[in-house]
Amino acid sequence: MKSGFVSIIGRPSTGKSTLLNSICGHQISIISSTPQTTRNKIKGIFTDKRGQIIFIDTPGFHLSKKKFNIALMNNVHSAITETELILYVIDIQDEPGIEENEILTIISKSKINFLVVINKIDIQKTKEREIMIFLEKKGIKKDNIIKISAEQKINIEEIKDKIYANLQEGPLYYPEEYYTDQEMNLRTSEIIRGVTIKKLKEELPYSLYTQIEILEDRKNKLFIKANIIVAGESQKGIIVGKGGQGIKAIGEEARKIISKIFEKKCDLFLQVKLRKNWNKNSKLIKNLIN
């Protein structure tokens, strides 16, 4: 039986979280077209008769000197050092740039085995030729490259095979039925944040986080009271929406997802609160990003 830890890295919006969810068969990480939706190192667990793979989904790799981004990049570097294999995900629509060079430099210095995963092959207009030329110039062998569509689940079984081929014999780190090690509070908080980002799309920057005040199981029914924290006054109005329709829609969708995942009915109460410039508070950022 084989087992091991595998980090998933790449630029923002390349489909890292979709890949994690597709392999594990559950919604573990937030999926959004908004770059850098993933903040924490999210663990997903896949177990079959061959063994167990523990995936670590990481924030999108983006070069920036902002405090929040620096904290996210520290998470990426930390995840790489914890794993036996790296999945480097490239969006087939993106022409290789400075981030690709930097990521491959980091991988090379780590001395850790890696696979280049070219994602979204179901899309018509691509930069596949430019990507392959770039990888060839970097000395990446074709055996280390796999082309997939995480969303359409194309070549997902093949990527599992390649991962197992790179892992050593080892024990099961988690019980077979586990597909994540996230605590209920964190999962619930991330579901609410994910729905908020999805509903607002480009209207709201990344200046929000969610905070669970109460999460209780009351006679086999979840009672949840949570806050959506924003950094600016104008953002409160965007989330609440006209006549409270925005926050109502967020609550309804989040409630459905929470009920489905935890297989229990759910009472969810949301409130939007202002914490001015929280995204410039280094201590708070450190607490939010683990």
UniProtKB/Swiss-Prot annotation:
Region listing for G3, in residue ranges: 57-60
Regions annotated as coiled coil: none
Residue intervals of the KH type-2 domain: 200-276
Domain Era-type G, chain residue ranges per copy: 2-169
GO terms of molecular function: ATP hydrolysis activity; GTP binding; GTPase activity; ribosomal small subunit binding; small ribosomal subunit rRNA binding
GO biological process terms, semicolon-separated: ribosomal small subunit assembly
Subcellular location as annotated: Cytoplasm; Cell inner membrane
Entry-linked PROSITE patterns: G_ERA (PS51713), KH_TYPE_2 (PS50823)
UniProt entry tagged with the keyword Ligase: no
Protein name (record): GTPase Era
Organism field: Borrelia hermsii (strain HS1 / DAH)
